[in-house]
Amino acid sequence: MSTVLSVKDLCKTYIVKKNSNNVLRNISFELGDGEFVTVMGPSGSGKSTLLYTVSGMDAMTSGSVNFAGRELGTLSKKELSKLRLTEMGFIFQQMYMMKKLCIFDNIVLPAYQAGMAHSEANKRAEELMRTLDIIETAEHEINEVSGGQLQRACLCRALINEPKVIFADEPTGALNSKAAADVMRELIKANRGSTSIMMVTHSVRVAAMSDKVLYLMDGDIQGEIVLGKLENEDTLPERERSLRNWLVERGW
């Protein structure tokens, strides 16, 4: 398996009132092509910060992040912006959709910006919205839809450019069980189509659907468990039990 994301000795420090807060400490890991990796850990362990930093949304303090052969730390703002637009997809807890645009236009905009033909982009956006059961929200503004609908719209937007990697921070956190299942079904479908996924979640059941889980505590990776591809949903309960036992051993 070739590597799409290679992280070495990554550190992230915030300075607050002249005090240093070392949120990430010498983090190293790899994400392979078509691999689905989840990061778990207690609240405040640095999970979301890790996701933002390795995706170039937040600057690293030191270390190396290599995305598909390019060192993020050496890219200009313009180069990094283009890379995020065309090769990365994002589902973050605070997605900054444009308030003046309807849901459909928010979803399709990244495809237009990436140079996709408008007819193709419109067709793809409509297909994604139908699959995730939010086509009725197409002309609604973002303040006119539920949190669950907005989260599914974020997934549509993340998928529209068929990115190399999707970075997802609690993608099912605001959803009911049906909507959560729909989101995970689409993420797994994208992953089987060779898109790599790096996800943060507190849900053991959701994490058990991934190939590998990293355990983050106090800004450091304390261990990993390899679950392999989820080939049959009937095996999910056993995967969930194995993962839960592994997490408990680490103080979960």
Label each residue range with its predicted role.
Residues 55:
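Helix-to-loop junction immediately C-terminal to a conserved catalytic motif
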Residues 140-143, 160-161, 193:
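Conserved signature/switch motifs of ABC ATPase nucleotide-binding domains
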Residues 166-169:
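Catalytic Walker B motif of ABC-type/P-loop ATPase nucleotide-binding domains
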